[in-house]
Amino acid sequence: MAKKAMAYIKLQIPAGKANPSPPVGPALGQHGVNIMEFCKGFNARTQSMGDTIVPVVITVYQDRSFSFITKTPPAAVLLMKAANITKGSSNPKSERVAEISKEKIREIAEIKMPDLNAYDIDAAMLIIEGTARSAGITVVE
């Protein structure tokens, strides 16, 4: 018989830097999960990713065991890293903070492809371009 899922916890944690302090500790502790076991597993799986923020979905089962799936970094984080900026525009319609090329958009779309709801790379590029527009980043040819 399959284990019955009790809760799903979604977190965004820097790669290789999960520790029991907030937000990880309280989120897992309220469901009775072994926090250190998660931290060790997450850090081992993501240590090669550098300093990127990694979304993770943790499934907690009724017997207090858990499994987790790491996703690709958020598109906004990848865009800001590619454009060498720390923060997006506070008013993206009128204030542009950076420019990014179509080639960089394609690279980011290829990285994000497993997590995007798109069938081909062109559709994925349109999604990433929309995210760039929302952050105040101009896409140039």
From Swiss-Prot:
GO MF annotation: an example: large ribosomal subunit rRNA binding
Stretches of the chain forming a coiled coil according to its record: none
Presence of keyword Ribonucleoprotein: yes
Highest taxon above the source species: Bacteria
GO BP: translation
Pfam families assigned: Ribosomal_L11, Ribosomal_L11_N
A Gene Ontology cellular-component term: cytosolic large ribosomal subunit
Keywords: Methylation, Ribonucleoprotein, Ribosomal protein, RNA-binding, rRNA-binding
SUPFAM superfamilies per the UniProt record, alphabetical: Ribosomal L11/L12e N-terminal domain, Ribosomal protein L11, C-terminal domain
PTM statement from Swiss-Prot or TrEMBL: One or more lysine residues are methylated.
Family designation: Belongs to the universal ribosomal protein uL11 family.
HAMAP family (UniProt xref): Ribosomal_uL11
Task performed by this protein: Forms part of the ribosomal stalk which helps the ribosome interact with GTP-bound translation factors.
PANTHER family according to UniProt: 60S RIBOSOMAL PROTEIN L12, LARGE RIBOSOMAL SUBUNIT PROTEIN UL11M
Record note on quaternary structure: Part of the ribosomal stalk of the 50S ribosomal subunit. Interacts with L10 and the large rRNA to form the base of the stalk. L10 forms an elongated spine to which L12 dimers bind in a sequential fashion forming a multimeric L10(L12)X complex.
Name of this chain's protein: Large ribosomal subunit protein uL11
Gene: rplK
